[in-house]
Each structure stands twice: as structure tokens, then as C-alpha cells.
């Protein structure tokens, strides 16, 4: 079963995040490309959620996640910081 949650990250953005599987299992984070959303990974998540805890965010600028203004808000180091912040946030919930 999958569920959606809105997560405020330490980077200042809120992302919609879909999860599936048991939090006790090893995690996998699925990251979509341009111009997709978490739905890119729905079939993989369904197939892997019995063995892994699957995490698929709608990254900044996509779907219902926050859409900060300005090109600087979408540079690679900023996007990487979002993923790291998501990882830290999920890890805090896992342990």
C-alpha cells in the first residue's frame, strides 16, 4: 500500500512524497526526471515494496510540490540538497 505525505525539508521547500512498503526494510529513493513526477516509478514501487521501503518525491517545481521562483532555486547543488534533506528526514523516521 502506498501513501502520500507533505514534507517540509530543511532546505525550505515542501515536497509531496509517496512511500510504499515496510519502513523496516532497506530504503530506495526513486527520483524522476524532467518533466515527470513520482508516477514515473509507480510500477517499480509496486514490484519492490514487498522487499524495500520505497520513497518517491515529486521534486521541487513538479506536480504539487513547492515551485520556488528563479533559476538559482533549480541548480543541481540545490536539488541535491533537497534529496539529502529528504534522506535525513526519512532516516529520522526510520530509526
At which residue positions do the language-model features occur?
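Conserved HGGG/HGGXW glycine-rich cap/lid loop of the alpha/beta-hydrolase fold
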Residues: 16-67
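Alpha-helical elements of Rossmann-like donor-binding domains used by nucleotide-donor carbohydrate transfer enzymes
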Residues: 2-4, 40-43, 47, 78-85
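Active-site loop/oxyanion-hole signature of alpha/beta-hydrolase fold enzymes
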Residues: 10, 18, 56-95
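N-terminal cap/lid segment of alpha/beta-hydrolase-fold proteins
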Residues: 1-14
